[in-house]
Amino acid sequence: MCIRDRLKGTHREVMIAKFLMPVNTLRRINIAVPPKAEYESGFSKWVEHFCRMGSILGCRVHFFANERTLMRLQQLVKKRHAGTPTEFSILEEWEDLLLLTGQVNYDHLLVVVSARRGSISYDTSFERLPAQLGKYFSNNSLIIIYPDQFGEPQEIVSFSDPRGHNESQHYEKVGKWFYKWLKKN
C-alpha cells in the first residue's frame, strides 16, 4: 500500500522517519512548520511529541515557521512545555525550506510538518518535497509528519477535491522517494 493510500485511508497522525544515527545522540531537533499549521486539529499533539522528545533527549527544539505560526507555537510551548529548551526562528516563505541546510547538521533531526492534500495548511510546494529532501537533506536524520485530522477517513471532504475523488500522486512520490532511499542505503 502506498503512502497516498495510507494517508487517505486514515485521519490519524502519520510519521515517516529516517534515522542515520541513534536517537539518543541527537543534539537538536529542527522543525519546519508550514503556514496555517496551527489550524490543524493535530497541531498540539505533534508539538507535544517533539517537545517531550527534546526534553527526554536533553536537546534543543528549534521551530522554523512564519510569524503568525511562530506566535501560536510560542504560546503553546510556554503554556504546556515551559521546561523544554526551545528556539523560534522566522521562515518567511515555505519555499525557503532550503535555507535550513545551513541550520541542520549531521547530529540534528530535521522534522518537516506536512499536510494532506486539501487540508488548510496544504501547500502545492509539498509536491516538490521528496526531491528537495533527497537532494539537500540526504545526509540528515529526518521525520515527515502528517498531523491528525478530524472525522473518519470516508467523511473527510477536502477543499481541493470536494467530491472525494482520488486525491493525487504526490503522496506516492514521497513513498517512492523513501523506498529508493532505503533501497540505496
Name each model-derived stretch.
Residues 1-94, 105-109, 114-185:
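Intrinsically disordered or low-complexity boundary/linker segments at protein termini
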Residues 102:
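PAPS-dependent sulfotransferase catalytic core
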